[in-house]
Structure formats: structure tokens, C-alpha cells
Amino acid sequence: MITLKEALNKSENELKEIKTLLRQRVKENIELNAYIGEINESGSGVPILIKDNINVKGWEITCASKILKGYVSPYNASVITKLHENKMCAFGRANMDEFAMGSTTESSCYGRVKNPLDTSRVPGGSSGGSAAAVAAGLAIASLGSDTGGSIRQPAGFCGCVGLKPSYGRVSRYGLIAYSSSLDQIGPITQNVEDAALLLDAISGYDKQDSTSANLPSLNTFKDLDPNARYKVAILKDFLKDATPQIQEAYNHTIKILESMGHTIVEKSMLDTRYHISAYYIICTAEASSNLARFDGIRYGTRSESKNLKDVYLNTRSAYFGEEVKRRILLGSFVLSSGYYDAYYLKAQQVRKKICADYESIFNECDSILLPIAPSVAPKFGSTHSSLEMYLSDIYTIGVNLAGLPALCMPVSKDKNGLSIGMQFIGAKFKEQNILNIAYGLEKEINN
């Protein structure tokens, strides 16, 4: 597939031919289930696939949930407006985990997405459709959202580049919220250059988002420097949960970075089990609040009932999926008066400790190298409990708790041809550093 960098230099007539080709490819690869429904486009320009939780004016937006079936967005998310300002357009809806809750893209009301590298395996989640489409050549690039690894993990499983920007770098206006203090929109692309281009296009201050950082526009693409050298921290104590092949790929990546001239520094952090506990308390608490609005009254699907209480009860029971209901219940529990101090307050204290740990490392280092997941993409049905699925996020969620930028890129393949991804984590608003390291490593691996 043509890269974003190449596509931006094409004429509108040439882009129309590319869009026709993409439509044909999607039809030919319908079994991947990466796209949802008919392929719409929001205007002229380079086509960018959009996750089904980002508003595009006049398009149905469902968050892959039955409860929002038929709801048509009345406005554009800020990132869509920015695409239009940068010679790009929204093109098609990407399948996802329902309300972005999941790590496998199996909870969608449209059916599960398959990994193009091995269709018996998950593509990762929750932006599984976005990553599968880019990996299969069904999209030039795509936009996903990352609450606890939902851009990076599917990018790692499918063999793409996924970039989660710093919290506040990209406007969340028009993103249907899952966990407001953790959510962030970002690009999934074929290579590091394209990730920088798409990040530059969608980033910037937005007065419509109160959490948007008032910072100058980015020029990460123009400033890409594969020869820049950095201090990279490694966290070997985190590897105890990883499979031998992930550990081997991690150590091999360290050797390549050292041979390139980067300085490797061994560091330690709060155990990942604290990351998991704090994350799932905070994100479910925020989700229970954010999803309270989906009640069958103002928009979306409604269950006909005899009284108001039954409208709420029947609508939410019938049209929310099992994983969404589980997280709403957990969030409501930790926010209840008897348990708020014991769980939610403690989780926020742990979050502060995690932020302090990262800050301490970034006082001495420029980046942290970590795996994207403890294993390669698992087979469908091999995850037997929600807890098992939650544990697959151990390497990604700390980044969201601290609001940091992180970039996942493929570094190798296992014996079955499955992608192994590693991530570079940066200090807040230091996207340039991780892009430079990844760009240099990408060139080194490709050579």
C-alpha cells in the first residue's frame, strides 16, 4: 500500500483511484471484518480510516455497541477538522471493541476482527480494526484511541506503528469518552515517518477541549533525525511476566540500540501489578460515569417499557455488551460511599506514585524501552477470563496513567511469522525523542 508520505504528493484524481482500490480491497478481505458497513468519505484528500468512537458529521457512530445503533453524528471531532485542513479526509469506519473496552476486538456488536498475519488470532484491541486494516493494506493510515494501550497493542500484534501522544497533545473533542483522564486519539501507520506526519496534522491546542495543552504546533516530521542518540532506560524486572520469545526480542532490541550508539541505563519501577490495579479502578470509575448518558432517552436504541425506571433498566441490560456491563458495575462499586476511600482514593495515590517513578527516570533518561505485551497475539478463545485479558495490558497502562507519549513499532517476528512489537516511552510532550529513536531503529532493522 502507498504510504501517507507518498499519498500527500498525489493529485486528487490519483487519490480517487486509490480510494476505489481501497474499496475493492476491503470487499476482497471482508473476512477480516476491519471495516464497519458502507465506506463513506468526508471530502477530498488522502483517505484516513476512522475508529468508530470518533465523530464525523453525518456518519453513524456506534462505538461498536447496539445501544448506539442508528445514531448519526451532528458534528465533526476536532481531529477530523484538522485532517481536512491538512489535505486528508475521513474514509470508512474501523471496527473496535465495544466502547473501546477490550484488548482483543472481540466484543464488537459487528463481530470480531481477525489478525491479517494469522486469522486464527486476535488483532489486539480496542483499535483492532484500525490496526488490522493498515497491516492488511486496506488503509493508508488510521486514527485510533488509546486508553490503556488500545493503539499500541493492536499495532504491535499486527505489525504496524502505533503512536499514543501525550495527554493533552491531541484534542479529545468529538471522541466518545471511555475514561476521560486516560483517553487519547493517535495514529496507526505503516512506518514511523507516517506516524509523525499524522501526529503533526491532528495535534494542537483546541479551546473546545479543556484538557488540551496550549503548546506550539508540532513539526515532528520535518525534525525527524535518525542519527540523534539518547539515553534509553530498560526495565528488566518487568520482563518476568513475558514469554521467552518476548524477552529474547527485548534483549536483541537493546543490543541493536547499543550498537547504534544509544546509551542503555537499567532502571526499576513500581511493580506492574500496582499499575493494573490502579488502572482498572480509575478507568472503570470514569466509565461508569461517562456511560450513564446512554440510557435510551436522548439518543441511540431504546427498549419500550411501561415506566421510566424500566426504560433505563431494560435498555442498558439489552443493548450493552457483557464486558461493558462488567466495567460499569465495577466502576459503580468503587465509587460507592462505602468503598470510595478503600479503592478509588488509593488508586489515585498509586497513580501519583507511578507518575513520580516515571519522572524520576526521565530526570536521567530520554526514553524507556518496554515490550508492548507479554506475548505475541493470542489465538481466539485462548483467553479464559476477563482478568487474563486485563493482564495483557501490563506494559501499556502505566503510560496512560502518567499521560506520557509512547510509540510501538515492530522489531521482529516469531517462528510463526507473528509480529513482536516494542514501545518507546517518552517524557511528557517529548514525542520528538521517541519518534527519532524509533525512526533510527526502523532504518537499522530494515537495512
Swiss-Prot record:
User: What is this enzyme's catalytic activity, as reactions?
Assistant: L-glutamyl-tRNA(Gln) + L-glutamine + ATP + H2O = L-glutaminyl-tRNA(Gln) + L-glutamate + ADP + phosphate + H(+)
List this protein's GO terms for biological process: translation
Question: Which UniProt keyword terms apply here?
Answer: ATP-binding, Ligase, Nucleotide-binding, Protein biosynthesis
- Asked if Cell membrane is a keyword of the record, the answer is no
The reply on keyword Cell inner membrane is: no
Q: Where along the chain is the active site annotated? A: 51, 126, 150
EC number(s) on file: 6.3.5.7
What SUPFAM superfamilies does the record tag this protein with? Answer: Amidase signature (AS) enzymes
The record's section on Gene3D superfamilies has: Amidase signature (AS) domain (3.90.1300.10)
Q: One MF term from GO for this chain?
A: glutaminyl-tRNA synthase (glutamine-hydrolyzing) activity
Q: How does it assemble?
A: Heterotrimer of A, B and C subunits.
Name the family: Belongs to the amidase family. GatA subfamily.
Under the heading NCBIfam families, the entry gives: gatA (TIGR00132)
Q: What does this protein do?
A: Allows the formation of correctly charged Gln-tRNA(Gln) through the transamidation of misacylated Glu-tRNA(Gln) in organisms which lack glutaminyl-tRNA synthetase. The reaction takes place in the presence of glutamine and ATP through an activated gamma-phospho-Glu-tRNA(Gln).
Entry protein name? Glutamyl-tRNA(Gln) amidotransferase subunit A
Annotated organism of origin: Helicobacter hepaticus (strain ATCC 51449 / 3B1)
> Corresponding gene?
gatA
